[in-house]
């Protein structure tokens, strides 16, 4: 069962408990994409058989750095089909072939790193590792609810706030005001993170009503 912890277009948070329960009834594995969650919403990778996560979203790292986690149950059943030299038990003995001994751990799924991306990722991930992500979520989703209140729409309790904007009129107003937002699946999508505050909520409201 493959799902995104946070849906990209709407910011809706998946009901992980229900998904895990349904998967267990059918003896199915679960794979959770945490790309739209890690860095703003607490994520416990131990709940799932696999998680995948790119770091260029809420973790604010350069493109090219990503993570995979595997449960012991799933790890025991998987073998990479196109393993590169970095998946070898001894990477420096795995450069030229023709034979290679795969790493016995999940490192056998590693690929050759995008070196420059990981230099940047080390700094940003280090920053987030020192934060209380529950507090980050409380702050970001609180700003999202403040925007909902100001716009007169139901609170969504999310860091990503979205509403119907099929014509793109609202998005155009925000862009014209110098506010970065996006249009996804016929909806306007606005989000809040560490560097946002109440003044940003007011800026969005002013631009939409101007």
Where are these regions (language model features)?
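Short, glycine/acidic-enriched loop or turn micro-motifs at the edges of active sites
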Residues: 36-37, 57
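Active-site phosphate-binding strand-loop segment of PLP-dependent enzymes
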Residues: 1-35
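Active-site PLP attachment segment
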Residues: 47-93
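Short beta-strand-to-loop capping motifs
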Residues: 70, 163-167, 192-194
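Structural motif of enzymes handling amino- and sulfur-group chemistry
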Residues: 91-148
